[in-house]
Amino acid sequence: MADITMLILTDHDWFREQFAKLDDLQAQTPVDQRALERVWRPLADKLDVHAYIEEKIFYPQLLKRGTDDAEGETLDAIGDHNDIRDGVRDANAAAIATDEWWAAVGRTRLANDDHMGEEEREGLADFRRHAPIGLREALGRQYREFMAQHPTTKGLSIVDRDPESYVEEQEGATRSPRKDFSLGIGSLKGE
């Protein structure tokens, strides 16, 4: 079973391949709008679904397990995801193959390329070094199942998140309210 870090890397490779296909299609004369749609639609959906599931299962665990500035890595990643979502949204609002569409696709690609490079160097590497393989594989199963169930964004709330609020929510979720205020050292009566 592949661990989550390997599945994320596999998605990153797929994203790069799809953007390369768009390069090839852009070079063709005349531009084939239907071919662009066949590449863009699944790419746009997967970019959004990929960010969604990372925010649901990967980044909360990175905040718990990471030690190499996991909070900074997460803040940056959520901001990057917002930039990617904005680019996808802008491209989806424009007519395919127009200058406006290509500009939005270009912004999406740039934001995604920056994010993937940082994530590969920082968050994924940190998680591999500090999270046990069993956890990475369990998260990999969840990730794979979710991606298989959601080939599109249908039914998912694809929204920008405030990075600082996201981190605060995740860190708050890991702290349970204390019910026992003892020192946790046992009885002092010698029993």
Feature-to-residue mapping (PLM):
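Small-residue-biased structural context
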Residues: M1-E191
